From Swiss-Prot:
Name of the gene: epmB
Protein name: L-lysine 2,3-aminomutase
EC number: 5.4.3.-
Domain Radical SAM core: 107-322
Coiled-coil stretches: none
Functional description taken from the UniProt entry: With EpmA is involved in the beta-lysylation step of the post-translational modification of translation elongation factor P (EF-P) on 'Lys-34'. EpmB appears to act before EpmA. Displays lysine 2,3-aminomutase activity, producing (R)-beta-lysine from (S)-alpha-lysine (L-lysine).
Superkingdom in the source lineage: Bacteria
Binding site for [4Fe-4S] cluster: 121, 125, 128
Location of N6-(pyridoxal phosphate)lysine modifications: 333
Amino acid sequence: MKHYNTKKLNREKDSWLYEISNSIVEPKKLLKFLHLEKYPKYYDSKPKKVFPFRVPYSFASRMKKNDPKDPLLLQVITKNQEFLNNLQFNEDPVKEKKDIVLPGLLHKYKDRVLWILKTNCAINCRYCFRKHFPYEKNKGNKKNWIQILHYISQNIELNEVILSGGDPLMAKDHELLWLITSLSKIKHIKRLRIHTRLPIVIPNRITSDLCQIFSNSVLKIIIVTHINHPQEINEQLSDSLLKLKKSNVILLNQSVLLKNINDNAIILAELSSRLCENNIIPYYLHILDKVKGTSHFLVSNKKAKSIISDLMKMISGFLVPRLVFDNGSKDNKLIII
């Protein structure tokens, strides 16, 4: 990965790039940072050869020291369980490959497309459902972007574009300005939805320039954050989320239900409360997509339903996310509750 000269970086604009370039890329280094050198049984470095290991320090700093069961650590640490063979788990659990119409563009639903804007992330979560996605054939470059814009302009039934990845906010501000300006010239496009985890792990990604881009856009901008545990929300993130709110951005959140991480109603109630405090609507709670190497994260449908049932007794209805599952064979996500 390219390392940036910090003397040349604009402190406000580019500090997030510095954080990415200086991320922790070795499991042992993260364990040392957390004073967990004596717990080698809790990780296996081999899985990082299949799916790279990457954790920014700003996210690692929210993990509890001396706690091998920290819920943030468990989302990112490599384990030999990733090599467990389970026939129910495969490399394309939501059957996305069949929906690729152009390099980087998926057209599954009639009125919207999903754009793989960038192929990398600031953090590599071990449960990621795209850990085996064919990114090499779907790279985010200007040539592909121009083809995608043409496709969108020619399909007038579309009214929404979803930016995904990787993480779409890995694109720099000037790239996003060009893209959003280009989309705003297509009259039938009304909404731009951005699915991202980057501001959660590196809050500095929400720059003043980015907020200005969102604020000036004629498109309705919706950002879907990926927050799984209340411990992920700190003061710095709250400040960045407030900037987005002031930029007329609609904020939603989706979480993944993860075994031994957030699979109880008390944690999810606290998460929904913290989200509400930060102007985010709890949107979806996903049953784990059965991607190869993630079976140790799976929470059964029966337990998931029980958790939601308990959650509904604890908090206001609007704070209860919809429990959903996507197996790729339906025209939409299956809403369980």
